[in-house]
Amino acid sequence: MNDHTYDVAILGAGIAGSALAVMLARHGVSTLLIDAGTHPRFSIGESTVPVTTLLWRGMAERFDVPELNHLAGFEHVRENISSACGIKKNFGFLYHHRG
């Protein structure tokens, strides 16, 4: 049994929970990251739109976590994380009208 006390517990090790955990830990916050699933698996955030790269770059700089730049663009993901990925052109919806 682990008797360690954590400052923060994050439920969900998806892209948002993992990013938050690394940002907090980088700044000295004792962080516990908990997830019910196992990887690899599809998860929300696995597909993002290009504008998201600006957010990753901003968080990398603001919170001094340069590793987040690995998520800031298709070429960075393929080079630093996995070559088993592609580019999602857009998220969109189709509307069907009678007639």
Task: Label each PLM-derived region with a short phrase.
Residues 16, 20, 39:
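Conserved Rossmann-like nucleotide-cofactor binding loop
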Residues 13, 23, 81-85:
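Short secondary-structure boundary/capping segments within folded domains
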Residues 9, 25-46:
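Glycine-rich FAD pyrophosphate-binding loop
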Residues 20-29, 55:
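A short, Lys/Arg-enriched amphipathic alpha-helix followed by its capping loop at the start of a domain
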Residues 41-98:
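N-terminal FAD cofactor-binding segment of flavoenzymes
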Residues 2-16, 32:
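Beta1/beta-strand and adjacent pyrophosphate-binding region of the FAD-binding site
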Residues 5, 28, 88-90:
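A structure-centric signal for secondary-structure junctions around beta-strands
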